[in-house]
């Protein structure tokens, strides 16, 4: 049976078109920088993007709230809440055309795990593309208040005796993260291992969706967890636990979430992919301004986004950290970064580290061709084209796809030109 498509003009259609035009005009006035539909316009006006209720999803939320997708010719973009990173993966596997999603606010390693079929049903590869990094820093490693007397902060070894005692009593020690092989998994593993605690032998790692972390610690389901904000802040505000360290203390200026898309969507809609990216980049610039933090906290706190009190978002967003163990730091540089200093640009060297760490913990084979994989997934070339069309100053566009050597809190150095040497320098690992 043929599908009949009618194109009659309705009053509702006229009103919708007029409303969209008015929105675009208003947004152009509020955000005068950048080009609108430079060259050929977007092939489509819609895309379905997923997000998890984490502060680093702010660029997608702000792009939607401020009409930036519409400004760049895509007024029908939908930003849809996902229940977990597993749900994000499953909906990306489906794709937008099958009632899933086309792209997402995503853990930076997850596109690689999907691209290679490591975390998909029947290990079926789902080609993925990284278009941008969404943020740096401001995740947290938090601990149940029963461990407050250990004085644990950056040095996780202070937990070793307490963990050993608990296990001797026949109890399980649980470390929670949000997705195997994701950023939170890698941060908590790095922190534990640096303190001499083997995350595969000395504790049990469990997966808990970000919005469920606080409730699960409240009922004693885990001893320590790693998650993004606002959940560490909420944990402290509710008096359930304390933050031992923020991830910026482990690796200052570390990459965190990415804007990931299905590769087939990007290939089919290259102009739309660039338009989406330009909207997100403008939103990142807005998010990065300290004067916008209170408004951003209020936006994110809305029911349709995070449904949390704005105060659970605001403090750490501004670099004010109440660790919950008597330690309070104000005006720190550990706040979440969204733009300045090349944050949005997806450095290939950063993806190289994520892959090296997942080799360390057995997610990828030691002989994985890291460079080939990064070149397949990381489309920093699209970011450069979008930046040019957006009018980003040449000085703000990184000259190289490598940020060079990275140094961690325990003195370890990662050279992206020699991941094997880095892996050889590590004591606790699965990879041999």
Regions of interest found by a model, annotated:
Residues 1-13, 20-28, 36:
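N-terminal secretory signal peptides
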Residues 269-381:
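Secondary-structure end/capping motifs
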Residues 352-432:
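Conserved C-terminal helix/tail region of periplasmic/extracytoplasmic solute-binding proteins
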Residues 38-207, 219-233, 240-253, 415-421:
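Short, glycine-/small- and polar/acidic-enriched structural segments
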Residues 101-102, 201-243, 262, 294, ...:
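Ligand-binding pocket segment of bilobal, Venus flytrap-like solute-binding proteins
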Residues 141-142, 258-261, 265-266:
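Short glycine- and hydrophobic/aromatic-rich loop-to-beta-strand nucleating segment
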Residues 56, 65, 88, 184-187, ...:
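Stable alpha-helical elements in mature extracytoplasmic
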